[in-house]
Amino acid sequence: EYLKVLGMGCGLFNQDVLGTAMGFWLSSPTSEDVRPIGQRIPDENQTLWLFTTDATPSTHRMTVGTRVSGLERGQYRFVYQDSGLVNRRWDEVVSGDVYCVALQRQTSFHTFDEVSRAALLVEVGPDGMAMTVEAIAGGKCDGQDFSFSGAEQIFYR
């Protein structure tokens, strides 16, 4: 909200919503890194950022490095749904279910693929401090029984 006070329209930068998928995720638990916060500079290839922007209020976005097998490094988006386990807002993806998101890849600064490039399975851990994901290249979010195949990866707050 502080950006609105400044008259900037891009929205809040810190979008970590505890207990949900929304926010910035790292490849290792932050409690293992005891250096002062100013010295902790994560490798962007090892991160996952799930967020929204004021510019496109009906979509949520994801920026990913090279760590998620099956996804090219870059930014993705999806039009969110208000119910079910498919394409839910990041801040509504909570512990207890495996969700599926159909991702459209960014192709230039202002454009994205018209159809989804991959499906992303997402499960938030019980305490909200870990999240399991698996990308399925060319996959779709068909059906309602989503389960991991063994190629999943864990990210941490």
Predicted regions located by residue number:
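Acidic, glycine-rich catalytic/binding loops that coordinate metals and/or anionic ligands
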Residues: 1-44, 55
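Beta-sheet ligand-binding and adhesion/scaffold domains
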Residues: 13, 81-157
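Short, hydrophobic/aromatic-rich segments at coil-to-beta transitions
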Residues: 19-24, 58-61, 94-101
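N-terminal glycine/threonine-rich, aromatic-flanked beta-hairpin/loop signature
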Residues: 33-86
